[in-house]
Design a protein with these regions (language model features):
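Compositionally biased linear targeting/interaction segments
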Residues: 2-3, 7-319
Length: 319
């Protein structure tokens, strides 16, 4: 009798253990399946968000294509400069959220690249002057400029106050210099000595795309000072013309506006003069796409260049 009870007890215990094992297996399968479903769902949402962001870029490009015919945004069709510079107001407009249907949305903001400092084009002196004019201590600005140049240049020879790969390795840095162009302005956060507060202060005036030309009719004084041959006197005179809504159409008008020392400095620097622009011909489009109720946001950045009256997308990045 006891033997029978022992057998039945063992069988019951075995059944319980089997039930526990099957439950654990079912739970694991459920967790794995849910994880995979989330991956698939996020992938699908990312794909649709990417399409929405790309739609934002294309819709904005189509709007820009109409401006040479209609005149610039915010200006009369027959207003001064509307034919010569049809994009003059395009960089100051931001599109509201646009619904595409099927619960997809985008928002796109155009930025005049001529009002930004291209950190892949600017030289060390120009970068130092930009940083100093942006209220950064001159000694700190000089060190930052050298470290940024060391990160960007192709060699491993450290500037006096800069930093190369070995310096980052010794300090246990997570990211090492690429010895090539920056892919995004926020990569500056990896440069030695860069703080969040300083980066957040200067990043809105930085870019990594475009020709590096600066629009004298719209750029701020710090951005103007990043140009070779641009003096503080010249930048102040240009800023005064901007405040007075006096448009500068060409280099001759600019030189006539400047005090003699500032004019001579610019005339003696053909590289700086070549990087002057008097109209908006490059726009950086920053588009965000998403689905209703989804936390996934897809960002697409594109460079649109005006060739004659045609806007062409010459570069884009999606992340």
């Amino acid at each position: 009798m006891r033997r029978g009870r022992s057998v039945r007890g063992f069988a019951l215990l075995s059944a319980l253990w089997l039930l526990v094992a099957l439950s654990a297996l079912a739970l694991e399968v459920s967790v794995v399946a849910r994880h995979r479903r989330l991956i698939v769902a996020n992938t699908l949402e990312s794909v649709r968000g990417e399409r929405a962001a790309a739609s934002g870029v294309e819709h904005e490009r189509a709007r820009l294509a109409r401006l040479p015919v209609r005149g610039g945004d915010g200006a009369s069709w027959n207003g001064a400069g509307s034919a010569v510079d049809p994009w003059q107001h395009a960089g100051s407009s931001a599109t509201d959220t646009v619904a595409l249907g099927d619960d997809a949305f985008y928002a796109v903001a155009p930025v005049d690249v001529g009002t930004l400092v291209n950190i892949n084009v600017v030289d060390e002196v120009g970068l130092t002057r930009f940083l100093t004019a942006s209220s950064i201590d001159p000694m700190t600005a000089d060190a930052f400029a050298q470290a940024i140049m060391d990160w960007r240049d192709a060699d491993d020879f450290r500037r006096l106050r800069g930093a190369e790969r070995d310096d980052y390795i010794k300090n246990g840095a997570r990211e090492l210099p690429s010895n090539g162009p920056f892919e995004a302005a926020d990569q500056l956060r990896f440069v030695r000595g860069m703080s969040r507060s300083i980066l957040s202060h200067i990043e809105p005036q930085l870019t990594v795309v475009g020709s590096g030309q600066v629009n004298v009719n719209k750029a701020s004084e710090p951005v103007l000072l990043s140009l070779p041959g641009m003096t503080t006197l010249a930048a102040a005179a240009i800023a005064g013309a901007q405040r007075g809504h006096r448009r500068i159409e060409n280099l001759r008008q600019l030189l006539d506006l400047l005090p003699v020392p500032a004019r001579m400095a610019l005339e003696q620097n053909p590289i700086g003069a070549a990087r002057l622009a008097f109209e908006t011909h490059e726009l950086e489009l920053r588009s965000v796409g998403w689905l209703k109720g989804s936390p996934v946001r897809v960002h697409e950045t594109a460079l649109v260049t005006r060739i004659g009256t045609t806007p062409l997308v010459t570069w884009r990045r999606t992340e």
